[in-house]
A protein has these predicted regions:
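Sec-dependent bacterial lipoprotein signal peptides
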Residues: 1-24
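Flexible, glycine- and charge-enriched loops at secondary-structure boundaries
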Residues: 10, 75-80, 176, 180
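A structural "domain/chain start" motif
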Residues: 23-81
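C-terminal/domain-edge helix-coil "capping" segments
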Residues: 25-49, 139-147, 156-198
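N-terminal segment of the mature soluble domain
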Residues: 57-115
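Extracytoplasmic/secreted cell-surface and envelope-processing proteins
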Residues: 69-70, 117-119, 172-174
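Surface-exposed short loop/turn segments
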Residues: 102, 106-159, 167
């Protein structure tokens, strides 16, 4: 097509295509009622063939919970906050939490770690997910990338029904009230990807 057009015509075509491409702009507008999320990167996968419905029974699977302790966070009850928010978000989905995994249709567990204990390569290899948050500063010793992976299993088959991974910068000197709000936001964002049917 361009062989028969003179150089000025080619330039005009390229200019029109370029202007048309540049004029397509995406703008994000904050709604005053929208939930403000953390600066976490979140990714999730849910099996479309296994349906979780309201009223389904869930239980913790303690042997699949992996919380990597770090001395720099020893005064912050991060594990308790994560578990509280997982429970809160599950109940908001109108499922039923039971004490024993033997009496539940689904089991839930999680892994939480800083990058020094569990890096992106290990997360991808173990969980098949890679949120890939690269916005964490590398030159600040007060911040390290943290990862949280939540997984739901179907008890009878041991199939993974849903898994979600989030990554964000973890500031070691963050005040407790800010840390609590941040964990709440990250968990809310993760659970938005978990579909529960009527």
């Amino acid at each position: 097509m361009f062989r028969n057009i003179n150089p000025l015509g080619k330039f005009a075509c390229i200019l029109l295509v370029s202007l048309n491409t540049v004029s397509c702009v995406t703008e994000t507008v904050d709604s005053p009622n929208a939930m403000k999320f953390s600066n976490a990167a979140v990714i999730a996968v849910q099996d479309p063939n296994i349906f979780v419905s309201k009223g389904s029974t869930f239980a913790w699977l303690p042997e699949a919970v992996h919380f990597y302790n770090d001395k720099r966070l020893e005064n912050a009850p991060v594990k308790a906050l994560i578990e509280k928010e997982i429970t809160k978000n599950l109940l908001a989905k109108e499922v039923i939490l039971v004490e024993s995994v033997n009496g539940a249709r689904f089991a839930i567990a999680y892994t939480a770690a800083l990058e020094s204990s569990l890096d992106d390569t290990a997360i991808l290899r173990r969980f098949g997910l890679s949120p890939g948050n690269s916005q964490v500063p590398k030159d600040d010793s007060n911040i390290e990338k943290g990862s949280l992976i939540i997984y739901v299993f179907e008890n009878k088959t041991n199939d993974i029904v849903w898994r979600s991974a989030a990554q964000a910068g973890v500031a070691f000197d963050m005040p407790m009230d800010e840390r609590k709000v941040r964990i709440e936001r990250v968990l809310a964002e993760m659970f938005q990807t978990f579909t529960v049917t009527e």
